[in-house]
Amino acid sequence: MMSMYEKFVNLLNTYCNQAGYPIQIEKTLHELSLDDANSVNVFTSEYKDLNSISMDSIAQNVVARIHFGGQSRKDVAPASVDSFLIDSNGYWYFIEFKNQYISSKKVKEDCVKKSYANVFWLFKILDEMQRKQLFSFDAYSSCTTEISPFEFVKKYCKFILVIGNDKVDNELNRIREAKKAKMTMPDSCRFLRKLESYVFKSADVYSADQFDREFVKKFRYS
């Protein structure tokens, strides 16, 4: 029996093929963590390298082409996170890798911009597939009732920011400690608090090693 993730991969492949732009949409987390500017991968697993959906590939090679006359250009593509997964419990994960300090203004702005944009264009695709009777939320999640897209994102979608190990600082440690103790997060991570309050079920940050131990090691497709 196919996992919800595998069925979602097939759904997006169907969308890409019907749009006339068949592409390879899956890559490993290691591959998707590549920092192009410095030619370094932010994440390497000691346990297992999960296959995941490349949101950048779909945004740049399919969505951009549909709206810009067949052009596959990064500068006209909608913003997107690096990776997307669905686990055995039916939760959806939007994952962004950054080889920068969490205190960086660019990191914070990118996370907010990419989250909003990616949710919008992905759910626009899902709306098109739903109109063709090829998609329903209950087939790709643990949702058992009819639900609006906005409610679905808030109840079943989670955001994860992964910071490179050599960019871990006191600010990241304070955020992690506050999260574990279920205390109010520092003002410096207000962008995560906003994402969790307004968009996602949760918004978390890990170092690459923490992500490996606490998420990847425990992750199950089915």
Placement of each model-derived feature along the sequence:
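Generic surface-pattern signal
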Residues: 17, 127, 177, 197-200, ...
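Catalytic cores of nucleic-acid endonucleases
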Residues: 100-178
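Beta-rich catalytic cores
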Residues: 79
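Phosphate-ester processing/binding pockets and catalytic centers
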Residues: 74-76, 88, 101
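Conserved catalytic cores of phosphodiester-cleaving nucleases, focusing on short active-site segments
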Residues: 83-85, 91-99, 118
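Short, low-complexity, polybasic intrinsically disordered segments
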Residues: 146-216
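Acidic-basic catalytic patches of nuclease active cores, encompassing PD-(D/E)XK
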Residues: 1-74
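A hydrophobic membrane-anchoring alpha-helix module
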Residues: 11-14, 218-222
